[in-house]
Amino acid sequence: MSQAIGILELTSIAKGMEAGDAMLKSANVNLLVSKTICPGKFLLMLGGDVGAVQQAIATGTSLAGDMLVDSLVLPNIHASVLPAISGLNSVDKRQAVGIVETWSVAACICAADRAVKASNVTLVRVHMAFGIGGKCYMVVAGDVSDVNNAVTVASESAGEKGLLVYRSVIPRPHESMWRQMVEG
């Protein structure tokens, strides 16, 4: 079976912990992330076979009720997405940069996955709602045309749920901004 990740984002920390427990009991999945995020929300990320992740997310979504911010089941995740969440994927030289900012972690991760599958870009980072008011953003680097395409695809993905905050393409970033965006 294919591997997948599932994400559940809630407005309540207590409800998030309750949902996480129920999700893990409902299906054979691995807990990848369970933590508070700004502003007082709770994030759960699970991994496993597609069917198991779908079952766990369905359980969590049902339990979350009106405290659900967003959810996602992402089968066959691109290999660069999880490293970009954990830290940074390295980029050798200064290139065009694209940034897509969303209102939810799930929307951003889905957008990042679609962008790197549709374009020849490096997914440099995915910053997940810590210290930025609960928003999430992704940074891609590459040739201008590829970055434009990636940002368009990612923006359309986040926009489908009404969760796009803003998008930007910087064709020739200043060296200081480049370092900030790709080195953290």
Swiss-Prot record:
Gene3D superfamilies: 3.30.70.1710. The gene is pduT. Its main location: other. It comes from Citrobacter freundii. SUPFAM superfamilies: CcmK-like. Belongs to the bacterial microcompartments protein family. One of its GO terms (molecular function) is metal ion binding. Its cofactor is [4Fe-4S] cluster. Keywords: 4Fe-4S, Bacterial microcompartment, Iron, Iron-sulfur, Metal-binding, Transport. A minor shell protein of the bacterial microcompartment (BMC) dedicated to 1,2-propanediol (1,2-PD) degradation. Overexpression of this protein leads to cells with either deposits or having lamina-like structures in the cytoplasm. Not absolutely required to make artificial BMCs. May selectively transport specific metabolites. It is found in: Bacterial microcompartment. SMART domains: BMC (SM00877). One of its GO terms (biological process) is propanediol catabolic process. Disulfide bonds: none annotated. This is Bacterial microcompartment shell protein PduT. Seems to be bound by a single Cys residue from each of 4 subunits. 3 ligands are provided by each trimer, the fourth ligand could potentially bind another protein. The cluster is accessible from both sides of the trimer. [4Fe-4S] cluster binds at C38.
